[in-house]
């Protein structure tokens, strides 16, 4: 697999991850606290793919590295929110664990 093919596959995978985050966030309770986390996780979880896509369209190697670092940071933040959701038992583990694994 060459770099362009890898990049296309990872763009697709990160977009699918963003969709899974949106679906996961819709399972959260309708409390004020959960709405705050829903907003945070949706923003960080969908940002991973958006920044990766931008990295693939970067104008320089420096810009590429910067966008990749942002994607990594957003993935770390998303994992943090998923861990909080898990610790609070807001979503069943069989639904949450695959999303955590993909993060």
In which residue ranges do the predicted regions lie?
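Amphipathic alpha-helical assembly/interaction segments
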Residues: 1-103
